[in-house]
Amino acid sequence: MLRALRSLGVALLLIGSAHAQELSAARLGVLYNIDVSNSREVALYYAAQREIPPANVLGIHLPNVDVISPEAFAPIRQQALDRLPTTIQSLVLVWSKPYAVGCMSVTSAFAAGYRSEFCALGCTKTPMSPLFDSDGWLPVDTVGWWPAMLLPSDDEGLARELIRRGIAADATALPGTLYLVRTSDPNRNARAAGYAAVELMLAHRMRVLELSTPVNRDVTDAIGYFTGVTHVGELPRLHFRDGAVADHLTSKGGELDGTSQMPAIAWLKQGATATYGTVSEPCSFVEKFPNPLVLFEHYTHGETLIESYWKSVQMPGQGLFIGEPLSRPYGARRP
């Protein structure tokens, strides 16, 4: 009896510890651009829908440009972090641009501060993230990072729909199929070497379908879609479940208004709830892109989208995380 009580006590401590480290609305900071239409409206709408405390919502002044200079960005970031409550552990950035700080993504620059070593000069690797495949979620307290996700606000209708999807997915267990697509592009197909491991490790939790060619029919059950091409020709055939994630390994996906390659925001317009793309040349290092296995390992253990996506990228300096950060389809975090 005594042993059983002790075991129960240990279990409760583990559960309590897990809940203490999970991301909640109370720990999410919401930043919007005072100088851009829709930014404030979307931020306030999001805070209301997610019941985020008003003290967590902060307006800042940002130039409405694609890329902000590191010199202009540094004081803006510092002033914002100084004004947010000390309980904040993650950020949502409610604007569409700037999406880059120099050659870093704006989400990574807010997370770690602008650091030149995060920018690849030529085809080089960049520093590892201390959050990669990590346990718990107290990044500010443990490593001094403020992981961020961009919630694009230029199209207010899309922003509201994105918020709806994220909330609608909560605690649904997200039934559906994870699609892993091989392509004929040898560089952009770099993640395919790990697809077999994804299927092996996740098949007991969801349907995982590895394809040697893009889908050639309409699919209505996508909870994830990972590929490697400059333009996703099959995009109109893809219909995503609320809470789904999708991205394509290519150089310029994070350039949200780009035309030479498909911008990552196209995934959101098609129905995904979160996506990812790089804002400067990554040279197809797989470490600079999301690892589907790591992402869904954390996602299916009850972590939020922002936690799961951030933990899936080893070298995130050039990568832009985009979507609704608090979506949690698989319920509360399990220890």
Language-model features: locations:
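N-terminal secretory signal peptides that target proteins for export/translocation
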Residues: 1-3
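Bacterial N-terminal signal peptides
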Residues: 6-17
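Cysteine-dependent hydrolase recognition
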Residues: 21-335
